[in-house]
A protein has these predicted regions:
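Short polar catalytic/cofactor-binding loops
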Residues: 12-17
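Acyl-thioester C-C bond-transforming condensing/cleaving domain
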Residues: 1-7, 19-52, 65-69, 76-172
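Short glycine-rich phosphate-binding loop at a beta-alpha junction
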Residues: 51-59
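Redox-cofactor binding/interface segments in oxidoreductases and associated redox assembly factors
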Residues: 11, 58, 117
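A glycine-/small-polar-enriched, mobile loop at the entrance of the PLP active site in fold-type I
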Residues: 58-66
């Protein structure tokens, strides 16, 4: 039986944060931003042969429109001469970190040696809720499901209250 091995992050990069709908990147496709991030990460590891990359896992909260049709596969197809497989993961605000965790797990259990993982999102191209929100009303018919509708702001307030973290402590 193969032993669980360690997984390492050998390069990390990100694009600058823009303002939704009116920022510098408002007309830049999210797959193009992702390609720039991937290429920047590759520059940090010049000895890594792109052919060694086995798969890409990219998190995306709203994988539709300009960030649809499997943004992981599209971006790696644009970034590399040789095709790299890809899968897009949706866990809303935790999509990117979930993608990284999934890639690390594949390495840890010996399913892969080299992975690309991260997140991509353009709130200018695909707004909150997607281009055509159509929420199932049955989800909100039960009181215990109300948390599904919480945004990160409300979630942060509840966590801060639960753990008694004041605004002043957060800003310090």
């Amino acid at each position: 039986m193969k032993q669980v091995q360690d997984a390492y992050i050998v390069a990390a990069t990100r694009t600058p944060i823009g303002r939704s709908g009116r920022g510098f990147f408002r007309n830049t496709r999210p797959d193009e931003l992702l390609v720039a991030a991937i290429k920047s990460a590759m520059l940090q590891v010049p000895t890594l042969d792109p052919k060694a990359i086995e798969d890409a896992i990219i998190g995306c909260s709203f994988p539709e429109g300009e960030q649809g049709i499997n943004i992981a596969r599209i971006a790696t197809g644009l970034a590399f001469a040789n095709p790299v497989g890809g899968v897009t993961v949706n866990r809303f605000c935790a999509s990117g970190v979930t993608a990284i965790q999934m890639a690390a797990d594949r390495i840890r259990v010996g399913e892969a040696d080299v992975m690309i993982a991260g997140g991509a999102e353009s709130m200018s191209m695909v707004p909150m809720g997607g281009n055509k929100p159509s929420f199932n009303p049955e989800v909100f018919a039960r009181d215990e499901n109300v948390g599904i509708a919480y945004g990160m702001g409300l979630t942060a307030e509840k966590v801060a209250t639960q753990w008694k973290v004041s605004r002043e402590d957060q800003d310090a």
